[in-house]
């Protein structure tokens, strides 16, 4: 199995601001995709849609306030099914460090390369949301290739 890993530092005196952006529909829709719905509680389902390109449904596995968010993909592209996504938060001074992992990819297909870059793009959108009050969720994110 293969994993996508990223680390992003967000200027924030408290990881609570980042945690809120990861655990509320309003927060998620302001950095990942503006079409976000669902119940963000353990056992709940979150639905993320990307216009005509489809989307993903996530089962919420873990919510540890100001520390960790973990989901399992239950619907979406075949390559994503049963993969897990986690955000681990650590505070260092005035910075909240986000350790991101999208784990369980079966093989390094072209779509995995695309998703790795897009995760980086959206994590920078999360950073912008927390630091400046405005993210760049889909459909306003940075475009990276001909798929978009």
Give names to the regions the model predicted.
Residues 1-3, 16, 46, 55-56, ...:
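Charge-dense, helix-prone N-terminal extensions
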Residues 7-11, 47-49, 59, 88:
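Generic structural detector for well-ordered beta-strands
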Residues 104-148:
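A conserved amphipathic terminal alpha-helix motif
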Residues 40-45:
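Short coil-to-beta transition motif at edge beta-strands of beta-rich domains
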Residues 18-19, 28, 46, 60, ...:
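Hydrophobic pocket/interface hotspot
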Residues 23-24, 65, 124, 131:
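Residues at helix-coil transition
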Residues 37, 53-99, 103-106:
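Hydrophobic-ligand binding "helix-grip"
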Residues 1-37:
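Hydrophobic ligand-binding cavity/cleft-lining segments
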